[in-house]
Amino acid sequence: MLINNSSANAKYNMVLNEKKISPSKTNCNLQWLKGALTPMLLDTETKFCDIECKFTIEAETEDEFEFKFSELNKEIIECVLKFDDINRLYKCYIQSVKEPVRITPYNWEFTCNWIGYKFSNEIIVKIKKEDSKNIKVRGNLKTPAMVEITPSIDLIDLVINGLANDPITIKNLHANKKIIIDGKEGTVTEECINKFKDTDLWEFPFLNPGINKISLSKNSCDVVVKYEPRYL
């Protein structure tokens, strides 16, 4: 098992005994009109899954255990978990850590509970001086996207369709200066400087599962789209 891409066993002399992972919770907004034979599904909202893990830490002394346990508690407040038998990652936020129980002179057992969401490794799609491209998105949930735009010439504006419900317009683009629209962080920068004032958008970039058709108003840019597939 990996915690933040480091082996839990190597770092804390810790083994995973048991894990329970729930499906992500989905809230359905339903309306059943008077006289209708079936309800109408208006929209859905997907939220966290629950993750429970039972661990054992081995230590020579109680003092050594307390040090390891303290360091672990700090690391798992917000973390990424990777289980050996699941080809998926879990972004997690701690909810509780139960009091450790000493089960042998050298072993302590405890349980951690997180909420989180499921995703897989980042996928990078390049659009090199083209005005359109179809992106087949893995996973089964909508996911935020990061868009990097590097124009080869100065441009008055660039309009991008297919990365949100409405077009995204960027103005005053400069040759060879990279603009990044980050759908996860909610930022727009040019060479690390805020460029939100030159951007017209109603929502930050995202991709839906399946085929997403991306179109650009000009073909003089190199565009990179990055996303992490998400799962229920």
Place the predicted regions along the sequence by residue.
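Oligomerization/assembly interface segments of phage tail-like spikes and tubes
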Residues: 38-63, 105-119, 212
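Short, acidic/charged, Gly/Pro-enriched secondary-structure junctions
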Residues: 4-7, 56-97
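Generic beta-strand structural signal
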Residues: 79, 108-112, 143-145
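Short, charged interaction patches at domain edges and termini
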Residues: 34-36, 96-129
